[in-house]
């Protein structure tokens, strides 16, 4: 591990020198490329330098303890050795996590799809609650959200809503949200006051660049139609809505939220690229051995991942057994406590697999 860390430190220093090179400074593209690579290594190099400093101090204190005759000073040294040993172990664990292979999609923007599941109108209302929860979380993170396509219901829910989230590290934070979300509450339309259970499905797709997925024009069928509003009523007399079918896979994407046919087509293509990339990823992961899969979950959309219980103000993530009793705050976008726990569990599982 130390040899690898020394190589990373040498590369970090080399990048620092390159950023000061007049030729590189004169080329903004090269400068930006080196600056990004330098910033990506900063955390691991800072942690490694502190680890090395602590290790040196620890070795010096142990050597001094062997020579020291004064009882009082021996006790001081022992206390300092204990403190430094604890810090060294903590830093070593941090370095192991920092050395874990990065998910190549972690820095990508995402396309999130939320669909109402079992439960009729109540499921559609819950899909709307989830959309607003992620929207508020994005606001707190200073990320940008944009609705790509939506099918609203008359009571303010969504049969389906597809939206983009752009910002730093979006996929790394939201990738564990894929799966079936379950709600338990008394519907406003329920006169008997009985608790109903409804579901919504969330899919998180890293946004695909054109270079990530090759789509041949002859593989697409593009249909143009009039857009419609809640309950199927016509809201637009111009043919601006777009439906794209990818013939080799049978994937179909529709978009009607924009007044411009061109913009709807662009948005639909964005979703199609992301879905094709996700399909390729799922095929690759399907080939992996079961023991190499993350404990946090495979992102399988049929996996029930979380329950939101309104009467008890409780949210439970079933993958890690985490229960919180402030559902109201979670729905207001306070998701970090859950996401941090999921990330930590994923890191621990990957460390265990690497050490095995």
Swiss-Prot record:
Belongs to the prokaryotic/mitochondrial release factor family. Peptide chain release factor 1 directs the termination of translation in response to the peptide chain termination codons UAG and UAA. GO terms for cellular component: cytoplasm. Methylated by PrmC. Methylation increases the termination efficiency of RF1. Pfam families: PCRF (PF03462), RF-1 (PF00472). The modification N5-methylglutamine is found at residue 233. GO terms for molecular function: translation release factor activity, codon specific. Transmembrane segments: none annotated. The gene is prfA. PANTHER family: LD18447P. Residues 284-306 have a biased composition (Basic and acidic residues). It is found in: Cytoplasm. This is Peptide chain release factor 1. It comes from Moorella thermoacetica (strain ATCC 39073 / JCM 9320). Disulfide bonds: none annotated.
